[in-house]
A protein has these predicted regions:
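Sec-dependent bacterial lipoprotein signal peptides
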Residues: 1-17
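A structural "domain/chain start" motif
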Residues: 5, 17-72, 190-196
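C-terminal/domain-edge helix-coil "capping" segments
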Residues: 17-35, 128-196
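Solvent-exposed loop/turn segments at secondary-structure junctions
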Residues: 50-51, 92-95, 159-160
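Sec/Tat-exported extracytoplasmic proteins
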Residues: 65-76, 90, 94, 147, ...
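Acidic helix-start/capping segments at beta-turn-to-alpha-helix junctions
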Residues: 77-97, 196
Length: 196
């Protein structure tokens, strides 16, 4: 009976040892010379020129940016007929944090005395799971005048979260980053803020 109680208890203890990481979103924005043109009219959303096109979940970020722009007062349209264009760039990397120490440790001890001597050996096994992978994401958005190509606004966001959090999906990460990027739009030019 005791064995059946201890097994779930041990599993709970191990589950509690799993580390989670969720950073705030670091946001920097730059406002161009014509801020009155921002937040209104038709705008198209597309990948930035030269942006890596291999990100499988790029569409989630593009959709999150489009939704954020619509909330600001833009009318998001397809094609090249819009007066402004939002160019989106995304880079995601996965890293596995290193363990603080090895999973197995060995200790040796010895003793001598008037009644003899003795040697002891100890073996320790770390049963905690390895730390989860951490996804680091960088997203940049540049709003340009379609005709001239002039930059009206630029924003950059950085965010990290371990794969065992709700932000493991690209969609959740994209919405969190877009919400932070457009928070208090257009923002103070050159200022970096952190959004939780």
């Amino acid at each position: 009976m005791t064995r059946f109680i201890l097994a779930p208890l041990a599993a709970l203890m191990l589950a509690g040892c799993t580390q989670t990481i969720v950073s705030p979103v670091s946001v920097t924005r730059f406002v161009g010379a014509q801020p009155a043109r921002l937040g209104q009219g038709p705008i198209a959303v597309r990948p930035a020129p030269g942006a890596p096109g291999t990100l499988a979940d790029f569409e989630a970020f593009q959709d999150a940016v489009a939704a954020g722009l619509a909330r600001l007062g833009y009318r998001v349209v397809a094609g090249d007929s819009a007066a402004q264009v939002a160019e989106v760039r995304v880079l995601r990397t996965l890293e596995r944090p290193a363990r603080g120490r090895g999973p197995v440790s060995v200790g040796v001890g010895g003793e001598t005395g008037s009644y003899g001597s003795g040697v002891g050996l100890g073996l320790g096994i770390d049963l905690t799971p390895p730390p989860p992978e951490v996804a680091s994401t960088q997203m940049g958005v540049v709003i340009r005048d379609t005709a001239s190509g002039q930059s009206l606004w630029e924003g950059r966001a950085e965010f990290s979260a371990s794969r065992n959090t709700p932000y493991a999906s690209a969609q959740a990460t994209a919405h969190k980053m877009a919400d932070a990027l457009f928070s208090g739009f257009p923002g103070r030019s050159g200022e970096t803020i952190e959004v939780k």
